[in-house]
Amino acid sequence: MDELTIKRVKTGLADPAIGPETIALMLTDTCNLSCVYCRGGRIDEGRGKAEESELTTEELFRLFEDAAGFKVKEVNIGGMRGEPFCKKDIRLILRKIKSLGLMGSMTTNGSMLSGALAEEMSSYGWDILLLSLDAPFARLQHQLRPAVNGKEYFHNILEFLGALNDNPGSRIRILVNMVITGNNYRYFPEMVNFVNNYRNIESLNVLRLVDMGLPGYSDLQLDCGQAAEFRETLEAFKREKKVLYAGNWSSPDVRREMPAGRHTRCFTNYYILSIAANGDVLFCPQQYKAVSGLNIRDVRLRDLWLNEHFSFRKILSESAPCYGECCTILRKQNEEIYNAVCDG
């Protein structure tokens, strides 16, 4: 984690006027895939009309301009509930972010990527693309993340990555997120080989399956035997520079790995401001729960950050009940901040 981020959090704990480093924006609630472990809005469920309640392009541009003026470093376009490329004017939105000198990162399912898009995004200097890819080949990817319209799309991902490979001037950093299930864990070695074929892929982030209340969760989760087998696989690849994961995978359930008495303090909201597609402020970029009384439509960014409703940040920094379900990246960042703030 960047030392400047840690310093910003330490200062922000004492001075509420220190703004966020990152705006985590859930751009749309509409998605063109029907992933087996996702509860997001799909086009076939009538969520295509969700744009009516979402922030308009003009409102988004105002937010980005406010962010640049508030010394925000990065706009992170999330994919928790929807696919960013389903958003109207998405290409204009990405260009606007970069035109203001902001760092741009985005999570995508990859289904709407193309070689032409790789060239376009490279031309205006897009920074990071987090690609949700759970298999190194089409059949399994389409099984785990099928398209609503039934069409195959894996070739679009290959075309995008291939175009980046062929463009030595492209600086787009690709972070591949792989959710481990009983269906794909045995293909992890092939996945490592896959990411090593592409220069722009910086990391393969190994993610646990999160229980989102879906009926098929138990069928997808690793059983104890599979978890032990996968742990041995991870051990074999521990020297692989691109492979990143949290915990020791001693249990299928990450919460069982947490030692008794381990801290559950979350500092995320001191450097990340999470905003839903309709403008509501969220408690966390991983927990889609709105903070009552806070919407970016009603107030400018600087004033919103100083609102009294943000007292929830201090509560979570003392104890966060959702800490055990946190994603790999945020848990690692929280560990570093905790060590610097509480032990340093």
Describe every region a protein language model picked out.
Residues 1-19, 41, 260-263, 280-344:
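Flexible mid-to-C-terminal extensions adjoining Fe-S/redox cofactors in radical SAM and related proteins
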Residues 37, 268, 324-325:
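Short, cysteine/histidine-rich loop/knuckle motifs that typically chelate Zn2+
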Residues 114, 247, 307:
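Residue-level signal for threonine
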Residues 30, 34, 265, 321:
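The −1 position to Zn-ligating cysteines in a subset of zinc-ribbon hairpins
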Residues 1-128, 143, 147, 155, ...:
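Conserved alpha-helical substructure of the radical SAM core
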Residues 4, 26, 46-50, 55, ...:
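Radical SAM enzyme [4Fe-4S]-AdoMet core and its adjacent flexible, acidic
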Residues 76, 246-247, 313-314:
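Short, hydrophobic secondary-structure boundary micro-motifs
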